[in-house]
């Protein structure tokens, strides 16, 4: 009896025993992002009385448990259960009740900055994991799967591997497209995105009222049928995602509105307009897209995509200057290809020692509109952030000595613990890469269609998010400020064929406690005193 009991204890300690769960979130793998994913899922599960996250990885169970306990103090209503084993093994997947899971998240074992052969192998393991889950379900419909895959080819393969829901995220593609948009908008757009992807803030929901739309309805009318929640677009009966459609686009009985809201419990649809706007005109002056001068520091897996996306956005006369420590032939090949496709943009790639203060000074950083500082990779996340911070300090020293207007400094941060240091370096827009990707993966595990919205939001065609000056919407020629209900801002944006998600108060732009001046989806009756320096957060086709 003693030996059997000891063997059973040893099995439990090694994490080999059966998991008796249903409707749980199953995570396969245990990497850098695991803590951020768990935090997001705990937030998403707050309204559930008893939720479970089950993790299967080839790590030691005790090590996984200790790491989770050491970094997460409050699990609210969520239980986190770990099991040790090979994630592609069908018997192991049966032990963690993969077929009964609410959703499955597959972590990629290779970071985006790792060598290509390592990433290819990691992608192959993700594909094998998907096939193993399909096998566990005996070919029947499987739980929704969200995974991260580096190769576009393998991503397409993953999404078409079965009849079930498989959503594959390409970290480099998503982050690159977002960074490109940050370079073109006013400061603060990263705060909007961070709020949108995290469960601890506002999110978009696919909404249809139980009693129907209450008669004929078009998209423009739908904007005024919610007090604070804001429709961003339509998910039609054919499965299409259409963000900021023309206002006369009908919302049919089978369509869902894509609604930006604090929570699905805060979405209330009214059959009649909730606000009667008085604004019926907007400033008539034509705003032309202005040329930009943008610098990119360092060559990474993201640089090429960022350059391509910026070229697709930028108007004639713009300049893109990339500075690298070692110039390679493939960089010139990309530059020549882009120059041929976008002859109206001046593109250059130059070799510079970015660690040399004098060489940096010769670049005249103060003459750029935006400077994008990318992390070139490293052995650890801390090492990568340390490099970025040291480069920021050198640029900051040059800008202080020039005492001119600073360019917009944008950087990516790997570890959210380094945000305060980054902000004190003069950065006005930043993106916590690990956190951002983890949040999207967690969100897509709860709502698979969310990834389709992000894919639409981060491409040059159609509408993207911008923070535009209030003077685009209201005439300030005779007044320094205007006081009005937020509903008038919604109406002014609609007259410009835009949807707004909120405001940016200029005086609070440096205040982290006030979300850097960002106010999202207030009630339409809430009054604001708006100055021309303030901004409106718009879903629009371009920056004008």
Task: For each feature predicted by the language model, list its residue ranges.
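Cytosolic regulatory regions of ion transport systems
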Residues: 3-544
């Amino acid at each position: 009896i003693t030996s059997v009991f000891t063997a059973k204890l040893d099995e439990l300690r090694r994490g080999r025993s059966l998991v008796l769960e249903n409707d749980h979130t199953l995570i396969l793998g245990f990497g850098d992002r695991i803590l951020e994913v768990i935090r997001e899922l705990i937030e998403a599960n707050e309204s559930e009385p008893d939720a479970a996250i089950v993790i299967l990885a080839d790590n030691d169970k005790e090590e996984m448990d200790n790491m989770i306990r050491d970094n997460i103090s409050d699990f609210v209503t969520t239980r986190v259960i770990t099991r040790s084993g090979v994630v592609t093994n069908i018997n192991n997947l049966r032990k963690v009740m993969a077929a009964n899971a609410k959703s499955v998240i597959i972590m990629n074992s290779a970071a985006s900055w790792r060598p290509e052969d390592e990433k290819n192998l990691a992608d192959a393991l993700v594909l094998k994991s998907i096939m193993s889950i399909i096998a566990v379900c005996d070919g029947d419909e499987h739980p929704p799967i969200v995974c991260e895959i580096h190769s576009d080819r393998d991503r397409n393969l993953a999404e078409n591997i079965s009849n079930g829901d498989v959503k594959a995220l390409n970290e480099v593609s998503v982050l690159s497209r977002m960074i490109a948009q940050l370079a073109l908008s006013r400061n603060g757009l990263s705060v909007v995105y961070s709020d949108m992807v995290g469960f601890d803030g506002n999110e978009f929901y696919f909404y249809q009222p139980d009693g129907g739309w209450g008669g004929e309805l078009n998209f423009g009318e739908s904007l005024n049928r919610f007090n604070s929640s804001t429709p961003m677009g339509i998910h039609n009966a054919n499965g299409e995602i259409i963000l900021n459609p023309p206002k006369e686009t009908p919302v049919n009985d089978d369509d869902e509105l894509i609604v930006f809201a604090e929570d699905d419990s805060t979405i209330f649809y009214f059959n009649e307009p909730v606000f009667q706007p008085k604004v019926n005109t907007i400033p008539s002056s034509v705003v032309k897209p202005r040329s930009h001068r943008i610098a990119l520091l360092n060559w990474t897996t993201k640089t090429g995509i960022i350059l391509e996306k910026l070229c697709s956005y930028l108007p004639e006369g713009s300049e893109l200057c990339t500075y690298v420590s070692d110039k390679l032939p493939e960089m010139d090949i990309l530059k020549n290809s882009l120059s041929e496709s976008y002859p109206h943009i001046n593109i250059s790639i130059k070799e510079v020692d970015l660690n040399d203060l004098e060489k940096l000074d010769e670049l005249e950083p103060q003459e750029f509109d935006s400077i994008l500082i990318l992390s070139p990779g490293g052995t650890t996340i801390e090492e990568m952030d340390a490099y970025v911070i040291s480069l920021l300090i050198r640029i900051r020293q040059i800008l202080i000595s020039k005492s001119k207007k600073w360019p917009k400094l944008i950087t990516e941060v790997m570890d959210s613990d380094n945000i305060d240091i980054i902000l004190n370096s003069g950065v006005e827009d930043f993106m916590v890469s690990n956190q951002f990707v983890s949040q999207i993966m967690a969100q897509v595990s709860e709502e698979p269609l969310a990834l389709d919205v992000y894919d639409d939001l981060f491409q040059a065609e159609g509408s993207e998010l911008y923070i535009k000056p209030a003077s685009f919407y209201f005439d300030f020629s005779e007044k320094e400020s205007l006081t009005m209900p937020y509903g008038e801002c919604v109406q002014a944006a609609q007259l410009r064929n835009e949807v707004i998600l909120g405001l940016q108060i200029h005086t609070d732009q440096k205040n982290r406690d006030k979300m850097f001046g960002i106010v999202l989806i207030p009630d339409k009756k809430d009054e604001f005193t708006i100055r021309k320096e303030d901004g409106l957060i718009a879903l629009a086709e371009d920056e004008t």
